[in-house]
């Protein structure tokens, strides 16, 4: 089906339930939904995290996508659901399958019971039925839960997201800050298609006014396809640094990470992520413009936040912890 941008109809005024609304992408989605006149309700897992909202326009309900019994109160009178919860590494009592498959199934069931008319689901580019990559496989499983629900849906598969408070670009900034030679696993030629988190949030807000986007799965990227080497260079330029790269053999790093991830509670990178380095994380060029009618912002000139990363922050991230002042934006 050929999709083209259509004029926005202004305020939509729906009751929208957002999961993951206090997170990096979620805060931007909540803002985009409010700006378009929707009533926003957030499912909040950790009491207190709703403090990220400086306004009182957001209704808060406490619950967990892993606890179906906690969801019913949050979903009353909901007309649309935006499901954002996902993890990039397994945690205790929260495996990829727990969160991406079963958690999504629980949210879908609650949405269906509430009579929701649109389910907007953020997955990941590369999601597929290949069990070799647990992250991407469970993302695909989550998509199947949505598709099989009978609720009209829109699924987004974004490439890597950037924006203040992100993890990917901030970690690279930490490496640039700490190392005169920036370590790169493998050739660094693996491809990305960075998309601003603000722009994905805008796409989600626009979707609620678009009947033609129901039943669609959308791979989304920004204005430029880049290699990992290119991204490192762009981060270094944004920080006013000149850095050479030091390429580490993939097999050696795989063995090293296999040992350290058994020791560190939150390793900088996992063996699964190393194995996924060979997967191209790119979408069709111009997809955002064609479908949503606006040009996404480029990474260059829009990552000034990397200058907030200090040497101590870089060391902290190497040890597996994201500094609070970098993520709380």
Locate predicted features.
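N-terminal Rossmann NAD(P)H-binding glycine-rich loop of SDR-like oxidoreductase domains
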Residues: 3-6, 10-38
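Mid/C-terminal beta-alpha module of Rossmann-like enzyme folds, strongest
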Residues: 6-10, 207-269, 283-329
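Oxidoreductase cofactor-interface core, primarily capturing Rossmann-like NAD(P)-dependent enzymes
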Residues: 9, 129-239
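SDR active-site strand-loop-helix element
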Residues: 19, 43, 84-85, 119-125, ...
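Residues forming the Rossmann-fold NAD(P)(H) cofactor-binding site
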Residues: 26-27, 101, 140
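Conserved glycine-rich Rossmann-like NAD(P)H-binding loop of the short-chain dehydrogenase/reductase
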Residues: 38-47
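NAD(P)H-binding glycine-rich loop region in Rossmannoid oxidoreductase-like domains
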Residues: 48-106, 110-113, 125-129
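Conserved cofactor-binding/catalytic machinery of classical short-chain dehydrogenase/reductase
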Residues: 67, 103-106, 118, 141-142, ...
């Amino acid at each position: 089906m050929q999709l083209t941008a259509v004029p926005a109809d202004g305020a939509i005024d729906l009751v929208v339930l957002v999961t993951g609304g206090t997170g990096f992408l979620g805060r931007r989605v909540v803002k985009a939904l409010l700006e378009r006149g929707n009533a926003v309700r957030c499912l909040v897992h950790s009491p207190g995290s709703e403090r990220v909202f400086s306004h009182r326009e957001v209704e808060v309900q406490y619950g967990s996508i892993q606890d179906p019994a906690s969801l019913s109160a949050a979903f009353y009178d909901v007309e649309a659901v935006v499901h954002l919860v996902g993890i990039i590494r397994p945690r205790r009592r929260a495996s990829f399958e727990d969160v991406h498959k079963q958690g999504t199934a629980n949210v879908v069931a609650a949405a269906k019971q509430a009579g929701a008319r649109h389910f907007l689901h953020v997955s990941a580019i590369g999601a597929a039925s290949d069990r070799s990559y647990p992250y991407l496989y469970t993302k695909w499983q989550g998509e199947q839960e949505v598709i099989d629900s009978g609720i009209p849906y829109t699924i987004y598969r974004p490439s890597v997201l950037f924006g203040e408070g992100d993890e990917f670009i901030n970690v690279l900034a930490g490496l640039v800050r700490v190392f005169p030679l920036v370590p790169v696993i493998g050739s660094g030629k693996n491809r990305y298609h960075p998309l601003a988190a603000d722009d994905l949030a805008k796409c989600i807000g626009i979707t609620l006014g678009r009947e033609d986007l129901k039943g669609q799965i959308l791979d989304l990227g920004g204005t430029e396809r880049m290699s990992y080497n290119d991204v490192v260079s762009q981060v270094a330029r944004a920080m006013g640094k000149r850095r050479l790269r030091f390429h580490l053999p993939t097999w050696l790093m795989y063995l090293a990470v296999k040992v350290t991830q058994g020791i560190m509670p939150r390793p900088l990178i996992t063996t699964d992520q190393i194995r996924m380095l060979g997967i191209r994380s790119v979408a069709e060029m111009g997809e955002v413009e064609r479908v949503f009618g606006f040009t996404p912002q480029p990474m260059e000139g829009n990552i000034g936040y990397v200058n907030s990363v200090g040497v101590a922050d870089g060391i902290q991230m190497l040890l597996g912890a994201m500094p609070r002042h970098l993520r709380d934006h």
